[in-house]
């Protein structure tokens, strides 16, 4: 049963297993959790005073509570994952790596388009999810190119660039009939379902018939399609022979963040490595494992640095369909593997820490700038002016949080006004959504661009350290000082700022180029 209230009524909670949902004043779900004892677990939020930053922020905005009772704790695990997927609460761990497990979607339109989809909802057919993003993307490209399927969201009134380079069959200009396109889609579905050998045999027969009729151009097209499919079949067969029998997981908690790495080992050989960064919170390991193994098949054996709750082990067995061995080794080969993962966490995540520490020192920042956002403006003679924002997290690009901005309020060339607009839009949105601010903001430009951005932050009452970097001599400016900071351009801190600035510039240029190509096609 469930129960909700504008006030959080702890007395209404039972001593039973289930899930609880914290909500804000508008009823939006902020966090979903599971508990062996709902009353004890939820009450603990109000009894503790030394919360971690994430939980403290959650309790600041929590205004309501719902709960759902389950029969067992394993049922609570399953329900928790379902509720997280439904509500996408911002205080739950959202695995950045989740896009690796997207599906390939053929839509249900008259002329179906092919796309990558993270959720298998909507009309059409879904294939996947794929554990390997590389395999998924390769299959997607082979199918798209081989069968010349459309990818556009809305069919344009005239042929696009993809049609002119032979990558699309052009249903938008009636270059292909519904029946002909339908045949292409049928072949694509056959490939995506794994029936590649049957399709190749059928196409080989068709190719011979074309050649016998002296339809050599069509026969050559089929030959190329067959070659692509044969390579795909070989590649897929190799992938499907892999069976991971051990997952080894380790992590480091630092600066209220969890830096976690997962190794997949098959017969002593490392086959895959994945890393994740998310905010530290109580029961973070349990929350991570539930989310990750709800999307991925649990291994025969899971090697971890600390014991897992019995109900979590039962959950893993439920997902896999048989018992999952959980090892917490203290010595021997498995302990060496666990230490190896930890060493990789240290090197992989904190090899960049020296750059962050150098930046903190040179800029006299109050804390390590774990989250850095950088803005750049790009334009071509005042047309197609765009803004870009890149985010670096833990010293690395976090492309999931990159943002693009079409400049709306500025006419002609005005970098000062343009940078003001994108800064205003970015941080007013974060304030509105009650999201955390970055630790440092970087502006690509000199004192003028810096001043424009800083004024917008002041208007919004956003207190985040901000700097700018001028291109000529790579000079770094801060608000209130006429002269640049005494940081040499070949110092570690400056080189790191240049790296971030260059990434923002690259991202803006690519967006600018995309908009100009679209404009040319529409002419």
From Swiss-Prot:
It comes from the Archaea. PROSITE patterns: GIY_YIG, UVR, UVRC. The keyword Transmembrane does not apply. Residues 15-93 form the GIY-YIG domain. Gene3D superfamilies: GIY-YIG endonuclease, UVR domain, UvrC, RNAse H endonuclease domain. Pfam families: GIY-YIG, UVR, UvrC_RNaseH, UvrC_RNaseH_dom. Keywords: Cytoplasm, DNA damage, DNA excision, DNA repair, Excision nuclease, SOS response. CDD domains: GIY-YIG_UvrC_Cho (cd10434). InterPro entries: GIY-YIG_endonuc, GIY-YIG_endonuc_sf, GIY-YIG_UvrC_Cho, UVR_dom, UVR_dom_sf, UvrABC_protein_C, UvrC, UvrC_RNase_H_dom. GO terms for molecular function: DNA binding; excinuclease ABC activity. It is found in: Cytoplasm. Residues 197-232 form the UVR domain. One of its GO terms (biological process) is nucleotide-excision repair. GO terms for cellular component: cytoplasm; excinuclease repair complex. Belongs to the UvrC family. Interacts with UvrB in an incision complex. HAMAP family: UvrC. The UvrABC repair system catalyzes the recognition and processing of DNA lesions. UvrC both incises the 5' and 3' sides of the lesion. The N-terminal half is responsible for the 3' incision and the C-terminal half is responsible for the 5' incision. This is UvrABC system protein C. It comes from Methanosarcina mazei (strain ATCC BAA-159 / DSM 3647 / Goe1 / Go1 / JCM 11833 / OCM 88). The gene is uvrC.
